[in-house]
Amino acid sequence: MEQRVSIRTIGGIDLWVEEGGRENGPTLLLMHGLSGTGEIWGGVREILAEKWPGRWIIPDMRGHGRSAHSETYGIGSHAADMAALLDGADNPVLAGHSMGGLVGIMLASGLFGITPKTVITAGVKVDWTAEEHAGMAKLIDMPVRWFDSDMEARERFVLVTGLKDTVAPESDLARTGVVEKNGKWRLAADSRAATVAYADTRDIYRAARAPVVLAAGERDRMVTVEELQTLDPAARGLSGVGHNAHVENPQAFWELIADAAGISE
């Protein structure tokens, strides 16, 4: 199928959605993390063009990137959005980073009308401290910060997403993370989307009824492999990468997908 971009209205929210791949075969949904955009999967997307045997879907989730803002950002709202994108897909494969990974695990419960074949995650935070929750509460209530130039906003985007040493502000990815209004620029993400930090990862994981792969970069400062292993002793460490493993080493993330989905190289 031809690679295409569309705006899908789901639950009254306009979501930016990119699709590509092949008409026949399994469906793969890739979900970004907090403050990110679908373009963060650019490196993985290049591999999919050659190796994924079916269709792939990469959205900007509500309140992020080129999608519209919302009044609600609970993890269940994101899961319902993603389930709607997967309408008609049989046993889709789900892959997500951080927040997107947790959305995938919630979809593995079967409560949203889909039955994933497997869910592959990297960097899903397990436990939040009181101090971390206080920091998120401050972020949620913070007024919008406007910048005088596009480049200043892009620099802020790569900083808050933890990509400063990996992605250039001049990149296509950074462009998708900022918006302009009346000659000023801001981050595209709605700060209220940080409410996902109040989701209980352990409860959500316990409700999963489909196989879930848990992984984290060995340099991930958000979550350690040891913390993930309190959920699943088989949780994997990814060598040489940090929280944004899918950006730092797209091939390593693809190998997680291929292994879990039974795709032979």
Describe the predicted segments one by one.
Residues 1-29, 46, 50-54, 90, ...:
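Alpha/beta-hydrolase fold catalytic core
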Residues 34-46:
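The serine-hydrolase catalytic nucleophile loop
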Residues 181-230:
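Conserved serine/cysteine hydrolase catalytic core
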Residues 96, 100, 104:
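Gly/Ala-rich beta-loop-alpha elbow adjacent to hydrolase catalytic centers
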Residues 106-109, 114-149:
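Flexible "cap/lid" loop of the alpha/beta hydrolase fold
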Residues 148-199:
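Conserved alpha/beta-hydrolase catalytic His-Asp/Glu region
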Residues 13, 18, 42-45, 51-95, ...:
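Active-site loop/oxyanion-hole signature of alpha/beta-hydrolase fold enzymes
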Residues 241-254:
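Catalytic histidine-centered segment of alpha/beta-hydrolase-like enzymes
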